[in-house]
């Protein structure tokens, strides 16, 4: 599902990005028509994988249905697709709201689905929602910082990239926002102390999202 969203996001009619993670984008190699079809095919493949690969003896069907509904919500007309629309529309929408929809929804869904599969309590699900949303937006803010620095160095290739934190607030304010989101995400994990070391990867992912490819000290 995430791969499908990235393929579509890179299209000329969207962010118009010829590369992704240092490699040519899907449409750059195979053409726009094939990239659209690839994204369209990957979305349902994700749902099929969930249904076919989740052990029925370990995960109740009711939990599985909640996972499918959650993912569908996060990528649909009130989630990621809404964020992309607002980004393309270019209206007065706040950059924070756009980033929450484009990136926060998927981060939230990823965290919540893990909770559903594990049988988490309702209050834990809400903490996971807030954690995942914070990490998703954090990832986007750091991406904006990296992209801005690449542009300064003569790189960066997202021609139609919409609003970003760095364009609206500048790099220093964007870094402050990233620090705020990192703290918020970790704060939500404070309610999971009873799980001990099993929650450590969630803390590590927050630091990874914050630290990758840039140093706060040289901002």
Regions found by a protein language model. Give the residues of each.
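All-alpha prenyltransferase/terpene-synthase fold signal
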Residues: 1-219
């Amino acid at each position: 599902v995430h791969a499908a969203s990235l393929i579509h996001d890179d299209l000329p009619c969207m962010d118009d990005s010829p590369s992704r993670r240092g490699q040519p984008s899907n449409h750059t190699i195979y053409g726009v028509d094939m990239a659209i079809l690839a994204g369209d095919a990957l979305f349902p493949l994700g749902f099929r994988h969930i249904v076919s690969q989740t052990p029925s003896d370990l995960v109740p069907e009711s939990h599985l249905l909640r996972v499918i509904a959650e993912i569908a919500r996060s990528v649909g007309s009130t989630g990621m697709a809404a964020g992309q629309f607002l980004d393309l529309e270019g209206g007065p929408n706040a950059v924070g709201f756009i980033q929450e929809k484009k990136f926060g929804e998927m981060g939230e869904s990823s965290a919540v689905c893990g909770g559903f599969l594990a049988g988490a309590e309702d209050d834990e699900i809400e903490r996971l929602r807030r954690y995942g949303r914070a990490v998703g937006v954090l990832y986007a803010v750091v991406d904006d910082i990296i992209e801005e620095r690449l542009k300064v160095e003569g790189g960066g290739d997202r021609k139609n990239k919409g609003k970003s934190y760095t364009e609206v607030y500048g790099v220093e304010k964007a870094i402050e926002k990233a620090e705020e989101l990192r703290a918020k995400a970790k704060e939500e994990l404070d309610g999971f102390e009873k799980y001990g070391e099993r929650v450590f990867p969630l803390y590590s992912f927050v630091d990874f999202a914050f630290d990758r490819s840039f140093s706060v000290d040289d901002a």
